[in-house]
Amino acid sequence: MTKSELIERLASQQSHIPAKAVEDAVKEMLEHMASTLAQGERIEIRGFGSFSLHYRAPRTGRNPKTGDKVELEGKYVPHFKPGKELRDRANIYEG
């Protein structure tokens, strides 16, 4: 599901709310989550999961074109850990 699909689905389920208001709310929520992570804070949505930053240590990588070694700096990357309820619901899916 893309962000646009999420907005469309929410707008159709909440027909009393204008689609633009739904779009603005989704964008504002995602922006707030991104800025919270950028400040190094953890986000927990009970029953769904938590978002946090994990540190990736500096390492030696390779340039895929040339094969040359490249030193990569350490960095923080977003990490999502699903909650138990989400894990349980995902295990029902049989593709």
Curated annotation (Swiss-Prot):
It comes from the Bacteria. The keyword Zinc-finger does not apply. Keywords: DNA recombination, DNA-binding, Transcription, Transcription regulation, Translation regulation. One of its GO terms (biological process) is DNA recombination. It holds the Pfam family Bac_DNA_binding. SMART domains: BHL. GO terms for cellular component: chromosome; cytosol. InterPro entries: Hist_DNA-bd, Histone-like_DNA-bd_CS, IHF-like_DNA-bd_dom_sf, IHF_beta. Transmembrane segments: none annotated. GO terms for molecular function: DNA binding; structural constituent of chromatin. NCBIfam families: hip, PRK00199.1. Heterodimer of an alpha and a beta chain. This protein is one of the two subunits of integration host factor, a specific DNA-binding protein that functions in genetic recombination as well as in transcriptional and translational control. This is Integration host factor subunit beta. It comes from Klebsiella pneumoniae subsp. pneumoniae (strain ATCC 700721 / MGH 78578).
